């Protein structure tokens, strides 16, 4: 049960920080006994798959420390894509991924988009394909549910500046267009008044060894007015902290711009 709880906490067989594979404190024989004595109807069998075939698939993944040893490998001396257990890529090498994005990235753009943030790259018949995470694309069933609830949120938005990001995010999930994702974020960051806030999308990229693809995250938070007041007090006095910081005067700023920040009373989310 300890092993099960560790998997729940880390959302998989790899530790959420070290990304190292979590090994169970039981042996294979005991695990096989548990599976063989479980009702077949309760096992996650593929079509026409036998219990024996399921065990052949599962046992190396669970017990062999050399199989998918790390979710993310950052050793630049080896192929980081092939060495990582992340599912953002399939049958493709690091050099192929880098070359794929090199062709589409415009370094001269004043508003570059995050190419690859919402897609999976795979190679079939020596051709690289990109599967976009959107309505009608990869993960469509789940994304349609997201769109459903965002449409509900539109009807109860506190104000116009809160409603606009909802509409834009729906547009993004329908199209998968990363330019729309940028437009959404620009609108979202301008909402400094709403009591309820939301973060939703394929955002954090640390599960991708190359930092292209984002993992889904959704958080709803409620503003803590007292905490926000304290944070604003610090922000309003930023120049005082700059003046009294233990660094050489030539490195100190003469003027500090105030930025918006807020404290959250409570959060509810999934990562």
Model-derived features: where do they sit?
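Extended, Lys/Arg-rich, non-catalytic nucleic-acid recognition/anchoring regions
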Residues: 1-104
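Fold-level signature of zinc-dependent metallopeptidase catalytic domains
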Residues: 61-271
């Amino acid at each position: 049960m300890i092993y099960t709880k560790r998997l729940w906490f880390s959302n998989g067989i790899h530790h959420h920080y070290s990304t190292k594979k979590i090994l169970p404190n039981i042996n294979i024989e005991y695990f096989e006994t548990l599976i063989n004595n479980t009702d077949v109807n309760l096992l996650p069998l593929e079509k026409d798959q036998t219990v024996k075939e399921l065990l052949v698939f599962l046992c190396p993944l669970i017990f062999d420390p050399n199989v998918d040893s790390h979710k993310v490998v950052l050793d630049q001396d080896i192929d980081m894509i092939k060495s990582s257990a992340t599912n953002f890529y399939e049958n493709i090498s690091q050099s192929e991924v880098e070359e794929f994005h090199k062709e589409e990235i415009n370094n001269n753009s004043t508003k570059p988009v995050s190419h690859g943030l919402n897609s999976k790259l795979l190679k079939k018949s020596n051709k690289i394909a990109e599967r976009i995470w959107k309505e009608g694309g990869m993960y469509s069933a789940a994304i349609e549910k997201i769109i459903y609830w965002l449409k509900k949120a539109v009807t109860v938005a506190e104000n116009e500046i809160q409603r606009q990001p909802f509409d834009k995010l729906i547009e993004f999930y329908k199209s998968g267009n990363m330019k729309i994702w940028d437009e959404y974020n620009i609108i979202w960051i301008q909402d400094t008044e709403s009591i309820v806030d939301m973060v939703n999308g394929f955002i954090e990229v640390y599960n991708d060894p190359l930092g292209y693809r984002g993992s889904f995250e959704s958080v709803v938070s409620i503003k803590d007015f007292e905490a926000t007041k304290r944070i604003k007090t610090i922000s309003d006095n930023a120049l005082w902290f700059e003046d009294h910081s233990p660094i050489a005067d030539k490195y100190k700023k003469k003027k500090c711009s105030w930025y918006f920040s807020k404290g959250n009373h409570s959060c509810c989310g999934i990562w």
